[in-house]
């Protein structure tokens, strides 16, 4: 492969998030449902024989060694003793710090894409284990299926939630995930429920009230749009989303978003667009 190939690096949503326990080691146990979207960044890969990893558009102010895209490529290269190199570019559409998985998705697309085109032969499960060192959400994107997660997020079960249309908006604020989980008012004892029960109930997010109480940008945007749709938080934010049965309904509400707010319309995907493109199931071809 010498030509450049463009791979999708999709967004994700946490369709619900419940915190069921705070462990003695400080970690929170949760129940959450991840689903991919047909919207995201693009990663370009151009494989070569140089052995060098070259970033075509580095993030200003971020050292190469701290860039998740570069780290993912080097991790796979070192783990497999691969002698090949690559030029890697990214077209960013997802907001930084939005809670829609941009950085984790980028890292996963690089791992899966380079494993495929370098022909390093790791299974998706091996890649997921490798990717965990880059971030807790990276394995979700590597495995490539919508998933119900429990524990501290490490127990994953493939899931088939409805593939709805969504309006996703990014309030003009950055939210500290650590601060949210340290907040004394955060619910930490929501009763555990079975997946089948959760799928039949209305979904909420235990982090939402804390975030809305502390970040007026989130509270005001949700309140302003309430006359059109009910928006809720994904993860710890800052992005909020509303669910619709049709693209037309989503577009109608999207038209009412404030002009200074970034947002997009997307459809839920239970199989990652990346895995659809590369025709991946349980192991790379």
UniProtKB/Swiss-Prot annotation:
Record's keyword annotation contains ATP-binding: yes
EC number(s) reported in the record: 2.7.1.148
Gene Ontology MF terms in the entry: 4-(cytidine 5'-diphospho)-2-C-methyl-D-erythritol kinase activity; ATP binding
Family annotation (InterPro entries): GHMP_kinase_C_dom, GHMP_kinase_C_sf, GHMP_kinase_N_dom, IspE, Ribosomal_Su5_D2-typ_SF, Ribsml_uS5_D2-typ_fold_subgr
Keyword Cytoplasm (UniProt): no
Catalysed reactions, semicolon-separated: 4-CDP-2-C-methyl-D-erythritol + ATP = 4-CDP-2-C-methyl-D-erythritol 2-phosphate + ADP + H(+)
Gene Ontology BP annotations: isopentenyl diphosphate biosynthetic process, methylerythritol 4-phosphate pathway; terpenoid biosynthetic process
Keywords: ATP-binding, Isoprene biosynthesis, Kinase, Nucleotide-binding, Transferase
SUPFAM superfamilies named in the record: GHMP Kinase, C-terminal domain, Ribosomal protein S5 domain 2-like
Enzyme superclass (EC): transferase
Annotated pathway: Isoprenoid biosynthesis; isopentenyl diphosphate biosynthesis via DXP pathway; isopentenyl diphosphate from 1-deoxy-D-xylulose 5-phosphate: step 3/6
Active-site residues, Swiss-Prot/TrEMBL: 12, 137
Positions that bind ATP: 95-105
Transmembrane portions of the chain: none
Signal peptide (UniProt feature, chain positions): none
Role: Catalyzes the phosphorylation of the position 2 hydroxy group of 4-diphosphocytidyl-2C-methyl-D-erythritol.
Recorded family membership: Belongs to the GHMP kinase family. IspE subfamily.
Protein name: 4-diphosphocytidyl-2-C-methyl-D-erythritol kinase
Organism: Actinobacillus pleuropneumoniae serotype 5b (strain L20)
Gene field: ispE
């Amino acid at each position: 492969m010498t030509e450049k190939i463009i791979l999708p690096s999709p967004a994700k949503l946490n369709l619900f998030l419940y915190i069921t326990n705070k462990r003695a080691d400080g970690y929170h146990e949760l129940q959450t449902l991840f689903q991919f979207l047909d919207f995201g960044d693009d990663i370009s890969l151009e494989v070569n024989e140089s052995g060098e990893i070259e970033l075509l558009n580095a993030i200003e102010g971020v050292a190469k060694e701290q860039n998740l895209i570069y780290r993912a490529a080097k991790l796979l290269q070192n783990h497999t003793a691969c002698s090949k190199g690559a030029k890697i570019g990214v077209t960013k559409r997802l907001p930084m710090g939005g809670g829609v998985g941009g950085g984790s998705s980028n890292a996963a697309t690089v791992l899966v894409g380079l494993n495929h085109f370098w022909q390093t032969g790791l299974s998706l499960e091996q890649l997921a284990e490798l990717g965990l060192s880059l971030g807790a959400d990276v394995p979700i994107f590597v495995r490539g299926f919508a998933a119900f997660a429990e524990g501290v997020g490490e127990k994953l079960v493939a899931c088939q939630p409805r593939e709805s249309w969504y309006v996703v908006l990014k309030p003009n604020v950055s939210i500290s995930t650590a601060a949210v989980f340290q907040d004394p008012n955060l619910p930490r004892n929501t009763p555990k429920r079975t997946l089948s029960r959760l799928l039949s109930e209305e979904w909420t997010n235990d982090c939402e009230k804390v975030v809305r109480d502390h970040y007026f940008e989130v509270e005001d945007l949700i309140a302003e749009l309430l006359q059109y749709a009910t928006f809720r938080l994904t993860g710890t934010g800052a992005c909020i989303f509303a669910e619709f049965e049709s693209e037309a309904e989503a577009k109608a509400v999207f038209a009412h978003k404030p002009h200074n707010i970034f947002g997009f319309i997307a459809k839920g995907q239970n199989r990652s667009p990346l895995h659809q493109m590369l025709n991946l199931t349980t192991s790379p071809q």
